[in-house]
Swiss-Prot record:
Region (Disordered): 1-26, 86-107
Protein name per UniProt: Nucleoid-associated protein Maqu_1612
Task of the protein: Binds to DNA and alters its conformation. May be involved in regulation of gene expression, nucleoid organization and DNA protection.
HAMAP family per record: DNA_YbaB_EbfC (MF_00274)
Location relative to the cell: Cytoplasm, Nucleoid
Amino acid sequence: MMNNMGDLMKKAQQMQEQMQKAQEEIAKAEVTGESGAGLVKVTMNGRHDVRKVDIDPSLLSEDKEILEDLLAAAVNDAVRRVEANQKDKMSGMMSGMGMPPGFKMPF
């Protein structure tokens, strides 16, 4: 019984270390959201910090409202990509630990 408890504690510690490593990788990962067929691009890291905004020069002569809409759409696209990347990383890690798909960790 004591040996099983020791194994369980060791496994829990390994899971926590793997989770921390995955969270660090997710935070560093960068994705680029786009709108207007790539005329506006927003690069964001896994913590949702916007790292770069790229606006095609042809849009600078357009109506301000159009540019604002395209920028908002690009940011929203980047947020969705960050969330998809997080989900992929975590589900890959969970399946590697033998956890069922969709299992939510308590931390």
